[in-house]
Amino acid sequence: MGPLTVPPAGFAYVDANAFVYTVERIAPYRALLDPFWRDVRASGTSVVTSEMTLLEVLVQPLRQGDVLMESAFRAVLATSPDVHMVPIARAVLERAAALRAATNLKTPDAIHAATALIEGCTLFVTNDALFRRVPGLNVTVLRDLLPP
C-alpha cells in the first residue's frame, strides 16, 4: 500500500467520496486517509472542497434518517479548521461548463474539478479515475494506492 502524501505547497482538494470514507471509517481507505488527515493537521496544509460535497455526502444520511452521520458530515465540512468549503460561484460554473464540454465529466465532477483548478490545488484526492481527463489536475486515485 502506498502512502497518500500531503502536498509540500499549495492546497489539497478532497472529493466527496474521500469524505465519505473518512467519516464512515470505510476500510480499506481509512488506512490511507487517517495518516493523510494527521499530516494535514501537522503541516497546516489547507484542504479545499466544493460546497457540492455537502450535497453529495448528506444524501444517504438524510435518506436513512441517520441524524448522527448527518451531524458528523456537517461538523467535518463546516467546522473543521482543516477544511475550507468553496462556494459554487459563477466563475466555478463557467470553468465547469468548459471542462464538461472538453472532458465529458458529469456536472458535479466538473464543478469539483473547476473548484480545484480555480483554487490552485496541487493535489486532487478522489476514487474516480475519470478526473484524470482534466488537464492540469494532479489526481491521486485512492484505489491505486491499495495493494493488488
Can you say where each PLM-predicted feature lies in the sequence?
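Acidic, PIN/NYN-like endoribonuclease modules and their adjacent C-terminal/linker elements
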Residues: 1-7, 11, 85, 113-148
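Short, well-structured N-terminal submotif of metal-dependent ribonuclease cores
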Residues: 1-49, 62-75, 144-148
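Short, flexible helix/strand-to-coil boundary loops that buttress conserved ligand/catalytic motifs
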Residues: 23, 61, 100, 135
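Short active-site oxyanion
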Residues: 42-47, 82-84, 120-123
